[in-house]
UniProtKB/Swiss-Prot annotation:
Superkingdom of the source species: Bacteria
GO biological-process terms attached to the record: translation
Family: Belongs to the universal ribosomal protein uL16 family.
Name of the molecule in the record: Large ribosomal subunit protein uL16
HAMAP family assigned: Ribosomal_uL16 (MF_01342)
Molecular-function annotations in GO: rRNA binding; structural constituent of ribosome; tRNA binding
Alphabetical list of InterPro entries matching this protein: Ribosomal_uL16, Ribosomal_uL16_bact-type, Ribosomal_uL16_CS, Ribosomal_uL16_dom, Ribosomal_uL16_sf
Pfam families assigned to the protein according to its UniProt record, in alphabetical order: Ribosomal_L16 (PF00252)
Subunit and partners: Part of the 50S ribosomal subunit.
Amino acid sequence: MLVPTRVKHRKQHRGRMHGKATRGNVITFGEYGLVAMEPAWITNRQIEAARIAMTRYIKRGGKVWIKIFPDKPITAKPAETRMGSGKGSPEYWVAVVKPGRVMFELAGVPEEIAKEALRLAMHKLPVKCKIVRREELEGGDANEN
């Protein structure tokens, strides 16, 4: 499970998700990618489920890169607790994903296998996604600065 080893502050504000992703919106490592089409919080369990689905399908070949990390703590109060008495304790971690963010990358497998593996991962995530090739994303060359 992906969780930060140390954090400066245990609790965070929820924040807002405005606009499109300005970073992490190009394929840098792999040949195929899974791009988010809408904003969402993606939990560490969802990321892990998508990773397992992809790696099981591609079996031994290929390499998978996870481009998002759950670094935002989400707090929750116990059920049937009265209002007040402070903020709840951290329950799980999420990655904040904006539209256009490349979440997973895949390389070293044929196109049909890559697309099917990413499609399986798509079903594990709470966002609409699209599968893209490196050439389809503008500025998709890893050597561009």
